[in-house]
Swiss-Prot record:
Residues 1-4 form a propeptide. Keywords: Cytokine, Cytoplasm, Immunity, Inflammatory response, Innate immunity, Secreted. GO terms for cellular component: cytoplasm; extracellular region; extracellular space. It is found in: Cytoplasm; Secreted. N-terminal truncation leads to a dramatic enhancement of its activity (>1000-fold). Its main location: cytoplasm. Expression at low levels in tonsil, bone marrow, heart, placenta, lung, testis and colon but not in any hematopoietic cell lines. Not detected in adipose tissue. Expressed at higher levels in psoriatic plaques than in symptomless psoriatic skin or healthy control skin. Increased levels are not detected in inflamed joint tissue. The keyword Transmembrane does not apply. InterPro entries: IL-1_fam (IPR000975), IL1/FGF (IPR008996). The lineage of its organism: Eukaryota, Metazoa, Chordata, Craniata, Vertebrata. Cytokine that binds to and signals through the IL1RL2/IL-36R receptor which in turn activates NF-kappa-B and MAPK signaling pathways in target cells linked to a pro-inflammatory response. Part of the IL-36 signaling system that is thought to be present in epithelial barriers and to take part in local inflammatory response; similar to the IL-1 system with which it shares the coreceptor IL1RAP. Stimulates production of interleukin-6 and interleukin-8 in synovial fibrobasts, articular chondrocytes and mature adipocytes. Interacts with cargo receptor TMED10; the interaction mediates the translocation from the cytoplasm into the ERGIC (endoplasmic reticulum-Golgi intermediate compartment) and thereby secretion. GO terms for biological process: cellular response to lipopolysaccharide; cytokine-mediated signaling pathway; immune response; inflammatory response; innate immune response; positive regulation of T cell differentiation. This is Interleukin-36 beta. It comes from Homo sapiens (Human).
Amino acid sequence: MNPQREAAPKSYAIRDSRQMVWVLSGNSLIAAPLSRSIKPVTLHLIACRDTEFSDKEKGNMVYLGIKGKDLCLFCAEIQGKPTLQLKLQGSQDNIGKDTCWKLVGIHTCINLDVRESCFMGTLDQWGIGVGRKKWKSSFQHHHLRKKDKDFSSMRTNIGMPGRM
């Protein structure tokens, strides 16, 4: 394995079969129809190399950052369910360090519930089906440490414009 190659972010643009893309509206991530006037976000994916967060069953944790922004995706437990959120995370200069530095990471594995008020579309290339509640095969939250659970001032919903 090449550690420098592992530390380099892999970039992904998210688009579904209906040509909906993720865009930032303030500090909210929403889905909008792809057009020339829309600038979709690009996600940076980096594997966490901190052994504290290793899990042989679930695989390596990953960091999902929004390219060019100080925002990252993470999972928070809301009403007993893992929920995808955005978090202000400081400088992206820390990406690729040997520690996850208090980030709540995401394992790339099974079912993540999303808030019922959010309609997520059909992000087919990630195996996500049409639905309001479940991502068919995407992310599962990492165990939340007590000190990481309170992000209420940084929390935001993910969904369609006008559906919040």
